[in-house]
Amino acid sequence: MGNSKTNGFFTPEKYLYGIIQGLPPTLRGLAFIFFFLVAFYFFPAFWDLCGVLRGARGKGFPKRKSDANSQHSKQFWTHSDFPIWFLRVLIPTRASINSMKYPHTAALVR
C-alpha cells in the first residue's frame, strides 16, 4: 500500500531518509555532521570514492616509503591537514544545512 515516498517498497535508504527528514532542522544538521564524522574515522574508502582525498597537492596525501606498512600510514587524518579538511568538509556542510533549513534558497546557491 505504501505512500508516494516509498512507492510500496521498503529500503533502508528510504527509511533513513524519512527519519532524517522528520527531524527538526537543527537536529537534521547535526545528523548530517555526525554522518560525516563517522565517515571520516571509519570509512576512508568512502572519501576516496568521493574524491575528497585528492588533497591540496592535487594527487592525494603523499606516502612515505618508511612507514608504508605501518598502521599509521593507513590513517589519513593528521593535524597538519586540518585546515584543508575544515575548508573541504565543514563549510560545504554548513551550506547544505542552510539549504535543508531553507529549501527555497537552494536554487540560488547553485
Swiss-Prot record:
Any one Gene Ontology cellular component term annotated for this protein: membrane
Transmembrane portions of the chain: 29-49
Keywords: Membrane, Transmembrane, Transmembrane helix
Keyword Membrane: yes
Topology class, membrane: Single-pass membrane protein
Protein's UniProt name: Uncharacterized protein YLR111W
Organism encoding this protein: Saccharomyces cerevisiae (strain ATCC 204508 / S288c) (Baker's yeast)
Cell compartments where the protein resides: Membrane
